[in-house]
């Protein structure tokens, strides 16, 4: 299905395009869907930031990303697991909502850590928590890692800070922008049941 122009649409064709773009986002770093804006709730109000899409499970309807468990994001999710993820690319916006499930000291996080490359593991070796005030611009990394990737043994120190967030989706909205007129659909489900669609005015 070409996302640049809406052909004869069905709920099935929209879901197929939607999950295909999400799958590309996980696999391809240059895909527009490789990153999403994650919205959470903080004591100050709404909080949003980009995350990298690391997991797409179409069969179960689950998305996932990695984070540092010392981050404000993690604390916000512990207080309120409700999240919204927003993707945009090729004239298509996808909003996905669910309740985050946090993984740190479990098999899900262990497996994700094993699959994470050394250069990505380096992010979790920062000596202070993300968001900590600093007197100068800094990466927070140990000096010897500022221009190099850690070896396997060095990277192991980041495991304690590494965490996985999975989001079993309960609701998705698809919006296609087109000169001929935009198109919009909403999909919802109960638990891990089937998706039910409805058309919306854009």
Model-predicted regions and their roles:
Residues 1-202:
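Binding-site signature for planar aromatic cofactors or substrates
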